[in-house]
Amino acid sequence: MSSGGLLLLLGLLTLWEELTPVSSKDRPDFCELPADTGPCRVGFPSFYYNPDEKKCLEFIYGGCQGNANNFITKEECESTCAA
């Protein structure tokens, strides 16, 4: 294969990798955790990734403890966990 062909192939593979959404193998493990309001009762609207529905959903976070599957915005949740 010529060097031009190899460069084209490399470019196409790089583009494909960049455009491929987050897959479950690349998703952080904490994205699989259930929503956890924690023991406090302040009541912050937050988002968590639901692996069964494959999307980010809103829940009420109590303000302390909980787990890492807890995002301030839906966009942050989607960019971290959504496929």
Curated annotation (Swiss-Prot):
SMART domains assigned: KU (SM00131)
Tissue distribution: Expressed by the venom gland.
Family (UniProt): Belongs to the venom Kunitz-type family.
InterPro entries: Kunitz_BPTI, Kunitz_BPTI_sf, Prtase_inh_Kunz-CS, TFPI/VKTCI-like
One GO CC annotation: extracellular space
Gene3D superfamilies: Pancreatic trypsin inhibitor Kunitz domain (4.10.410.10)
Keywords: Disulfide bond, Protease inhibitor, Secreted, Serine protease inhibitor, Signal, Toxin
Localization (cell): Secreted
Cystine crosslinks: C31-C81, C40-C64, C56-C77
Pfam families on file: Kunitz_BPTI
Task performed by this protein: Serine protease inhibitor.
Entry's Gene Ontology molecular function annotations: serine-type endopeptidase inhibitor activity; toxin activity
Ranges where the BPTI/Kunitz inhibitor domain occurs: 31-81
Protein name, per record: Kunitz-type serine protease inhibitor mulgin-3
Site residues by UniProt (Reactive bond for trypsin): R41, V42
